[in-house]
From Swiss-Prot:
<feature type="modified residue" description="Phosphoserine">
    <location>
        <position position="128"/>
    </location>
</feature>
<dbReference type="InterPro" id="IPR001171">
    <property type="entry name" value="ERG24_DHCR-like"/>
</dbReference>
<keyword id="KW-0256">Endoplasmic reticulum</keyword>
<keyword id="KW-0597">Phosphoprotein</keyword>
<comment type="subunit">
    <text>Interacts with CBX5. Interacts with DNA. Interaction with DNA is sequence independent with higher affinity for supercoiled and relaxed circular DNA than linear DNA. Interacts with lamin B. Interacts with CLNK. Interacts with TMEM147; promoting LBR localization to the nucleus inner membrane.</text>
</comment>
<dbReference type="Pfam" id="PF01222">
    <property type="entry name" value="ERG4_ERG24"/>
</dbReference>
<dbReference type="GO" id="GO:0005634">
    <property type="term" value="C:nucleus"/>
</dbReference>
<dbReference type="GO" id="GO:0005737">
    <property type="term" value="C:cytoplasm"/>
</dbReference>
<keyword id="KW-0153">Cholesterol metabolism</keyword>
<feature type="modified residue" description="Phosphoserine">
    <location>
        <position position="99"/>
    </location>
</feature>
<feature type="modified residue" description="Phosphoserine">
    <location>
        <position position="59"/>
    </location>
</feature>
<keyword id="KW-0443">Lipid metabolism</keyword>
<dbReference type="GO" id="GO:0006695">
    <property type="term" value="P:cholesterol biosynthetic process"/>
</dbReference>
<dbReference type="GO" id="GO:0070402">
    <property type="term" value="F:NADPH binding"/>
</dbReference>
<keyword id="KW-1207">Sterol metabolism</keyword>
<comment type="similarity">
    <text>Belongs to the ERG4/ERG24 family.</text>
</comment>
<feature type="topological domain" description="Nuclear">
    <location>
        <begin position="1"/>
        <end position="211"/>
    </location>
</feature>
Length: 615
């Protein structure tokens, strides 16, 4: 394999594609397979160039002043001859310059132009800040003829490809991207003979979660796994040796009244969401420059829900019904989630291309899972944003309260157990914190990258309320007496986790809002080509995702309150660790694509991902 000539970070001069002009560039990286250098121009443009198009700075010598010209005798014209020339004849110099210009045009038109085409993904980027499409780049070669050429494009399916048109000028070059409609279209020549390129089909996008087979198994496996966990937890001995648990008849899992109660709960949260209370903020920019508006009233919805629940308890409403029909409620939520996912996919088929998610792929099964439309809305009602925090997260707290009351009734207690109080208090703090800092949700991957499909619908409406309340559900049938010294240690652990979690998130959010805040002047950063800075000190110099570390420490505290008799209550911390490690890998992939060399420097400065000195 030939050795590379230029090193990373070396400042050289690179030829602008399609011209003979060289500009000062910095070598970013080198691909040994394609033998292409990734370079960065002074204006921030990053391109891939061949080694022949790159020259060291020493090969360019400053030219002396003055210009080449004809001999002095030719420069000096005779005034008498000038006066005797026929007025109708053009000057000799004008004829010569016109001829030279014509020959230059011919040479310019016959020059072989090499343009690097970067095909866009078959869908827009939605809220993606980086605007990077994540697809490989390739080179198209063409010989430009003297006369204009017009070629037709054949496009497949719903996709639109990108043709690159170069308009070269002596001092100004620009690359224009023009979207080709699904029908045939012709280009009109402008200053230079315009070339149209036959764009080759884009290779299949790399899919997450194991691709189509992976998401297919997840969609069918997660609901089954959820019900097996709940059935195991209701057994007297939830040991793994007793797996699988006895399965109830299918007709016993469905009850229309339960489904009606769940719909009522969902509609109540919709009403609270639509109330004109709370401030309105703008989200991150979409691909077309729009910024959607969001009303931050999640905390108010929680207060109103608490008032409704308190009034219901005072009126004597029997909440034990939820515990005794817990499996039926889980099934009702699952059915509702599937129906909602079908609706979301069907409506996304008519959504404008600019409204599609950057995570979608064009495959029906995968897009049904990951979500095809980025921000599905009915008027001003944002379905994804609503489901992220309202029905599931607030429902989690309500279910915990139901389990606390069920423990008192089943175990004949005058007051709840200390373990149940710890679990309820810890998780209540977690939910209130999320609702109080609702605006931070607008910059998460769920909002700016993932569409709204089965993955988020099932996670928000089923997995969160019925799995995150698993410790409280476990304690109803398997009491655990926690001593006060042990409880004190658990509280300290929870407090440490919360300080890390909230401190890291608050620091990140404050820096995003105002990087020039004097209170943040002590923080060190790395500048990126996107214009943004990466924090490399404070909490974010400790690990790349210190908020994940705090989250996991808090999750461990929730599980410790359940004792050590069974591994079942520790399922949450095991699952949550796997979830955050996978999410960190997704973040790593997108940030590397977005920030490039700056992200590599950041990883050198902050080598640990989540667990300092471990991972």
């Amino acid at each position: 394999m030939p050795s590379r000539k230029f090193a990373d970070g070396e400042v050289v001069r690179g030829r602008w594609p399609g011209s003979s002009l060289y500009y000062e560039v910095e070598i970013l990286s080198h691909d040994s397979a394609s033998q292409l250098y990734t370079v960065k121009y002074k204006d921030g443009t990053e391109l891939e160039l061949k080694e022949n198009d790159i020259k060291p700075l020493t090969s360019f010598r400053q030219r002396k002043g003055g210009s080449t010209s004809s001999s002095p005798s030719r420069r000096r014209g005779s005034r008498s001859r000038s006066r005797s020339r026929s007025p109708g004849r053009p000057p000799k110099s004008a004829r010569r310059s016109a001829s030279a210009s014509h020959q230059a045009d011919i040479k310019e038109a016959r020059r072989e132009v090499e343009v690097k085409l970067t095909p866009l993904i078959l869908k827009p980027f939605g809220n993606s800040i980086s605007r990077y499409n994540g697809e490989p780049e390739h080179i198209e070669r063409n010989d430009v003829p003297h006369k204009n050429t017009q070629e037709k494009f054949n496009l497949s399916q719903e996709s639109s490809y990108i043709a690159t048109q170069c308009s070269l000028r002596p001092k100004r070059e620009e690359v224009k991207l023009k979207e080709i409609d699904s029908k045939e279209e012709k280009f009109v020549a402008k200053e230079l003979a315009v070339r149209t390129f036959e764009v080759t089909p884009i290779r299949a996008k790399d899919l997450e979660f194991g691709g189509v087979p992976g998401v297919f198994l997840i969609m069918f496996g997660l609901p089954v796994f959820l019900f097996l966990l709940l059935l195991m937890c209701k057994q007297k001995d939830p040991s793994l040796l007793n797996f699988p648990p006895p399965l109830p008849a299918l007709y016993e899992l469905w009850e229309t009244r339960v489904f009606g109660v769940y719909l009522l709960w969902f509609l109540i949260q919709v009403v609270f969401y639509l109330l004109p209370i709370g401030k309105v903020v703008e989200g991150t920019p979409l691909i077309d420059g729009r910024r959607l508006k969001y009303r931050l009233n999640g905390f108010y919805a929680f207060i109103l829900t608490s008032a409704v629940i308190g009034t219901s308890l005072f009126q004597g409403v029997e909440f034990h019904y939820v515990y005794s029909h817990f499996l039926q409620f889980a099934l009702a939520a699952t059915v509702f989630c599937v129906v909602l996912s079908v609706y979301l996919y069907m409506r996304s088929l008519k959504a404008p291309r600019n409204d599609l998610s950057p995570a979608s792929s064009g495959n029906a099964v995968y897009d049904f899972f990951i979500g095809r439309e980025l921000n599905p809305r009915i008027g001003t009602f944002d379905l994804k944003y609503f489901c992220e925090l309202r029905p599931g997260l607030i429902g989690w707290v309500v279910i915990n309260l139901v389990m606390l009351l069920a423990e008192m009734k089943i175990q004949d207690r005058a007051v709840p157990s200390l373990a149940m109080i710890l679990v309820n208090s810890f998780q209540l703090l977690y939910v209130v914190d999320a609702l109080w800092n609702e605006e931070a949700l607008l910059t998460t991957m769920d909002i700016i990258h993932d569409g709204f499909g089965f993955m988020l619908a099932f996670g928000d409406l089923v997995w969160v309320p019925f799995i995150y309340s698993f410790q409280a559900f476990y304690l109803v049938s398997h009491p655990n007496e926690v001593s006060w010294p042990m409880a004190s240690l658990i509280i300290v652990l929870k407090f440490c986790g919360y300080v890390i979690f909230r401190g890291a998130n608050s620091q990140k959010n404050a820096f995003r809002k105002n990087p020039s805040d004097p209170k943040l002047a002590h923080l060190k950063t790395i500048h990126t080509s996107t214009g943004k800075n990466l924090l490399v000190s404070g909490w974010w110099g400790f690990a790349r995702h210190p908020n994940y570390l705090g989250d996991l420490i808090m999750a461990l505290a929730w599980s410790l309150a359940c004792g050590f008799n069974h591994i079942l209550p520790y399922f949450y911390i095991i699952y949550f660790t796997m979830l955050l490690v996978h999410r960190e890998a997704r973040d790593e992939y997108h940030c590397k694509k977005k920030y490039g060399v700056a992200w590599e420097k950041y990883c050198q400065r902050v080598p640990y991902r989540i667990f300092p000195y471990i991972y």
